């Protein structure tokens, strides 16, 4: 098990981010010591965190990631995000064309 500080370093996120993910139900600690309040995470959760970070980098919102993790309409959510990215790409390409 990892304490939150070590887990945040391995996951390359801030402790504040982990607290937020806990608050919104995205990634809860595996164990919280009742005496100290220390939060502990497992190595399996590190994989989950990497997945969450990757989805955030692609531009998914926390609510979308919650839906993906829950398994609801995953294909539809991914398809919609792909369409959004393609549209953004086209807009940027058009702007670059105008600059030339």
Over which residues does each language-model region extend?
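Short, charged amphipathic alpha-helical surface segments
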Residues: 53, 58, 66-100
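Basic helix-turn-helix/winged-helix DNA-binding cores
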Residues: 1-62
């Amino acid at each position: 098990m990892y304490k939150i500080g070590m887990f945040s370093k391995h996951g390359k996120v801030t402790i504040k981010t982990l607290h937020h993910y806990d608050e919104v139900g995205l990634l809860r600690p595996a164990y919280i010591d009742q005496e100290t309040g220390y939060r502990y995470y497992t190595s399996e959760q590190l994989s989950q965190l990497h997945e969450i970070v990757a989805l955030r980098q692609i531009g998914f919102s926390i609510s979308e990631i919650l839906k993906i993790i829950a398994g609801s309409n995953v294909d539809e959510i991914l398809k919609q995000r792909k369409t959004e990215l393609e549209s953004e790409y086209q807009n940027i390409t058009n702007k670059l064309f105008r600059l030339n």
